[in-house]
Amino acid sequence: MPDQVVTRFAPSPTGFLHIGGARTALFNWLYARGRGGKFLLRIEDTDRARSTPEATAAILQGMAWLGLDHDGEVISQFERAPRHAEVALELLAQGKAYKCFSTQDEIQAFREAAQAEKRSTLFRSPWRDADPATHPDAPYVIRIKAPQSGETVIRDQVQGDVTIRNDQLDDMVLLRSDGTPVYMLAVVVDDHDMGVTHVIRGDDHLNNAARQMMIYQAMGWEVPVWAHIPLIHGPDGKKLSKRHGALGAQEYQAMGYPAAGMRNYLARLGWSHGDDEFFTDAQAREWFDLDGIGKSPARFDLKKLENLSGQHIAVSDDAALRHEIEAYLAAAGLPALTQTQSGDLERAMYCLKDRARTFPELIEKAAFVLASRPISPDEKAAAALASVSDGILAELTPQLQNASWTRESLEEALNAFAEAHGTKFGKLAAPLRAALAGRAVTPSVFDMMLVLGRDESLARLRDAAHPA
């Protein structure tokens, strides 16, 4: 095995980057990055009828959002078809593959007869050991000569040793009659040529591994380390599907989940490091290994995703968070922030991010800094303003005018004002929130006043004291 770890993610471009694929990409990325290796990207676009440029773009965009950078150029499997065919012809020349002239009708007749006689329907070609001199001038496929006795053992890092009797393996087609290679051949040739050392993929590919091993062994190539990871199930224990909610990675971006939270959650979806739930990217790269992957399907839990996302928002750098929120607005098709709003949002981030689980929740709390005068109070805020006389706010404004506009001076001024009116600051907080933000649920009054600054805060208080 080469010294450098090389992993790959090889999606088919027939749709968006779904959650299962995103997790597979993440596991490959973490394993390679944590070992100073390479993470490669191959687009398996051999199915020309279903592969689309739009799907390829969606996959690349989803990976970019998740921060899963790859090494080197994106490999197109379709463009490598001549190389795949070359390997099939090499096996043919070595006597490890053969030309099969059996027609589809003949194969179907063989299987029907086998079924009627209650014997194996596995097709055994009469052309396997035929003298080439007897070959007709007719279309043919190239089949590999599968071993007919013994066992094939898949040494899997997740599933353990999986043993398959060789008499259960057919002589797989490598090259179709039109000269195009089959997927099973293309995967092996590409992985070998790309230097892939570890194949980490869904366990729905486990059955393919035995057939792919035949090609590795026939070519005398080193077999990579296999790690077949369980699929993701919904909360009800059934395979994750549309009815369980959003499936595409970009849908979660548009819903306002931070990429770091999504990476953390996907990493924990089927892999564990002790009891650690929350961890940074650096910790994930350091800790991730194949031994920590469980055999049982993981269940997708939106509440856990929300909780982890909230923790990542809380510890994020303010500028980076503002930048990601702007990307979220674009992904969700929402209006972009103005330059002024962008700067104001970043300044306010310290008092917004502690309790937000998603970007929509954070933006809701940021309404006070994104709004412009005159502030229109919602129903609860209007009720809070109506609970005090306009004169109270009008009287308060000049007293704040001379405050030095620090948290300490504002607290002192507002508490003194409340005491002078025979009440406590808590009684004034609701109308002040309403005046400053037009909402009943906001960051603290002092945080809002500090973020808005003296002039804007006083102007909003005056507006509320003298409504139009």
From Swiss-Prot:
Motif ('HIGH' region): 11-21
Example of a GO MF term: ATP binding
Gene Ontology cellular component list: cytosol
Record-linked CDD domains: GluRS_core
Compartments reported by the entry: Cytoplasm
Xref: InterPro entries: aa-tRNA-synth_I_cd-bd, aa-tRNA-synth_I_codon-bd_sub2, aa-tRNA-synth_I_CS, aa_tRNA-synth_I_cd-bd_sf, Glu-tRNA-ligase_bac/mito, Glu/Gln-tRNA-synth, Glu/Gln-tRNA-synth_Ib_cat-dom, GluQ/Sye
Record's catalysed reaction(s): tRNA(Glu) + L-glutamate + ATP = L-glutamyl-tRNA(Glu) + AMP + diphosphate
Keywords for the protein's UniProt record, in alphabetical order: Aminoacyl-tRNA synthetase, ATP-binding, Cytoplasm, Ligase, Nucleotide-binding, Protein biosynthesis
GO BP terms, alphabetized: glutamyl-tRNA aminoacylation
Pfam families: Anticodon_2, tRNA-synt_1c
Main location: cytoplasm
EC number in record: 6.1.1.17
Keyword Nucleotide-binding attributed: yes
Binding site for ATP: 242
Highest taxon in the source lineage: Bacteria
Residue positions of motif 'KMSKS' region: 239-243
Function noted in UniProt: Catalyzes the attachment of glutamate to tRNA(Glu) in a two-step reaction: glutamate is first activated by ATP to form Glu-AMP and then transferred to the acceptor end of tRNA(Glu).
Assigned protein family: Belongs to the class-I aminoacyl-tRNA synthetase family. Glutamate--tRNA ligase type 1 subfamily.
Oligomeric form and interacting partners: Monomer.
The protein's name in its UniProt record: Glutamate--tRNA ligase 2
Species of origin: Ruegeria pomeroyi (strain ATCC 700808 / DSM 15171 / DSS-3)
Gene from which this protein is expressed: gltX2
